[in-house]
From Swiss-Prot:
GO BP, one annotated term: NAD biosynthetic process
Protein EC: 2.7.7.18
Organism: Tropheryma whipplei (strain TW08/27) (Whipple's bacillus)
Function description: Catalyzes the reversible adenylation of nicotinate mononucleotide (NaMN) to nicotinic acid adenine dinucleotide (NaAD).
Enzyme class, UniProt record, top EC level: transferase
Family matches, as HAMAP family: NaMN_adenylyltr (MF_00244)
UniProt record similarity statement: Belongs to the NadD family.
Pathway: Cofactor biosynthesis; NAD(+) biosynthesis; deamido-NAD(+) from nicotinate D-ribonucleotide: step 1/1
InterPro entries named among the record's database cross-references: Cyt_trans-like, NadD/NMNAT, Rossmann-like_a/b/a_fold
Keywords: ATP-binding, NAD, Nucleotide-binding, Nucleotidyltransferase, Pyridine nucleotide biosynthesis, Transferase
Pfam families with a match to the protein in the record: CTP_transf_like
Full protein name: Probable nicotinate-nucleotide adenylyltransferase
Matches recorded under Gene3D superfamilies: HUPs
Substrates-to-products reaction catalysed: nicotinate beta-D-ribonucleotide + ATP + H(+) = deamido-NAD(+) + diphosphate
Length: 186
């Protein structure tokens, strides 16, 4: 499951759990992006990685990969999937993403190659229409509506509002300890 996870929240965890259950996946690997080319302002990759580790620690089916944050320069999904394919040769790869991200997929680096590397699971998000992409390598899944977004969590912290129950408790504590999101970008 690729994402910025800035910060990771309960919506991400519910989606991962639901996809793992529906597609009988042995493991869901969370892959925090290193330096996403489409987003200018993101928190330090190691903070986002550690928050993902904290958030997923209690679920044996979840793990977190450093693959993108250890790569120098911009991180692209196609490079991540190629590297995962090399590491997990005999495994079927499923790439979990939101329908909002899928709508931009044709602008991604080597977009035509993506379909041969993994089966895509596009999860609907409140306020984002499902895109019509004819491809037998995409499954669309509606997950119980959880109107939580990372950008809203960051804005709440910046405004001094609580994020309890939106993100896991350990992540709330990590954000407070490291003073994340207090300034426009911190």
């Amino acid at each position: 499951m690729g994402g910025t996870f800035d910060p990771i929240h309960h919506g991400h965890l519910v989606v991962a759990s639901e996809v793992a259950s529906r597609f009988c996946l042995d493991e869901v690997i969370f892959v925090p992006t290193g330096r996403p080319p489409h987003k200018k302002e993101v928190s330090d990759p190691w903070h986002r990685y550690l928050m993902a580790v904290i958030a997923t620690a209690s679920n044996q089916r979840f793990s977190v990969s450093k693959i993108d944050i250890e790569r120098t320069g911009p991180t692209f999904t196609v490079d991540t999937l190629r590297e995962l394919r090399e590491q997990l040769q005999s495994s079927d790869l499923f790439f979990i993403t939101g329908t909002d991200a899928l709508a931009r997929i044709f602008s991604w680096k080597d977009a035509d190659t993506l379909w041969s590397l993994a089966h895509f699971v596009a999860v609907s998000r409140p306020g984002h229409e499902v895109v019509d992409i004819p491809n037998d390598r995409i499954s669309f899944l509606e997950v119980p509506a959880m109107a939580i977004s990372s950008s809203n969590c960051r804005e709440r912290v910046r405004s001094g509002l609580p994020i309890w129950y939106l993100v896991p408790e350990g992540v709330v504590q990590y954000i407070a300890k490291h003073g994340l999101y207090r300034s426009l970008y911190g």
